[in-house]
């Protein structure tokens, strides 16, 4: 028997209904903040990610699905979507459009990670990018947007972590300090950290090996090395978050796993997810567009929510989907009549299931479907224009006209 590939899975009902609710909430909140959807290809030229994400990141060195196309070009299934969105921004000259470009996306990404709870090799992200402003007001609004989505889907008990990783003016001094500190300490760390201590010391801070954490926690804080513009920017972001009533915790060694981040970085964690407890991450990337060939300065900030992990956090709290109406026709004439009724009720926005066969079986299925009502139709009901409608929760059964049934369904749905 052929099964789903390791690290992938089939999403089945009723779980898919929770996914749909989460996405509907996110789309509604994106609309409220004037974000518009963008859809990019699921594969891109490999150099987009090696240049954009960073050659020393785990994503590029270990996790990308890369293949050679028939023309010899190297292509990669997208491991994240910010680089793709910026590529589209440059290619289609979105800088020519008025104002900050606010774009969101929902879709699958691909990384060859070790499958574990909430982490898959094909996973889904809900993300957004605000491109065209360096203002700390935009940073705070993007973080507020994240918080609104999490609250909107019913997630509570999460923690917002923030930091500033400086810019090209102040970060080099910090990197040199890190390199000096790691000169004697790296030998006691994992192989990746030993290599990165020389090639990209900042990536050492992103190490997830538990045994290395005490060494990392003792390393200098980047906050102490921020230049005055970066420090002022970070203080403004914190102030705007406080104005909005958004609680946060500063994590001075949080750098996130992508090389393009600059200044503000943030992450949301949730205890229900265990050791790998991150729900989302994001940050500012003011130099990414230029690194991908843009002739126009295009500062931006964005985030991506791990939808698989978010759904896992809220799935148990979501109400079960309920079928509005189950129709039980008794006889051939009733089946024909019921099909028309079912179509009309569906056009009015109600979920309807028509069940042929014996009444006992229809009632059993209505219970299994979680139907609010069951409509029983026979020859007598058709002739009289009144139908037996049974409330499946109370057991009450009444005879109503078609319009009265429609009114009752409307009332139950509101």
From Swiss-Prot:
GO cellular component term, pick one: cytoplasm
Gene Ontology biological-process annotations: histidyl-tRNA aminoacylation
Organism superkingdom: Bacteria
Record keywords, A-Z: Aminoacyl-tRNA synthetase, ATP-binding, Cytoplasm, Ligase, Nucleotide-binding, Protein biosynthesis
SUPFAM superfamilies cross-referenced by the UniProt entry: Class II aaRS ABD-related, Class II aaRS and biotin synthetases
UniProt cross-references to CDD domains, sorted A to Z: HisRS-like_core, HisRS_anticodon
Main location class: cytoplasm
Catalytic activity: tRNA(His) + L-histidine + ATP = L-histidyl-tRNA(His) + AMP + diphosphate + H(+)
Enzyme Commission code: 6.1.1.21
Signal peptide start and end residues: none
Transmembrane segments: none
Cystine connections: none
Compartment list: Cytoplasm
Pfam families registered for this protein in UniProt: HGTP_anticodon, tRNA-synt_His
Gene Ontology MF annotations: ATP binding; histidine-tRNA ligase activity
Family indicated by similarity: Belongs to the class-II aminoacyl-tRNA synthetase family.
Subunit composition and interactions: Homodimer.
Protein name: Histidine--tRNA ligase
Species of the source: Solibacter usitatus (strain Ellin6076)
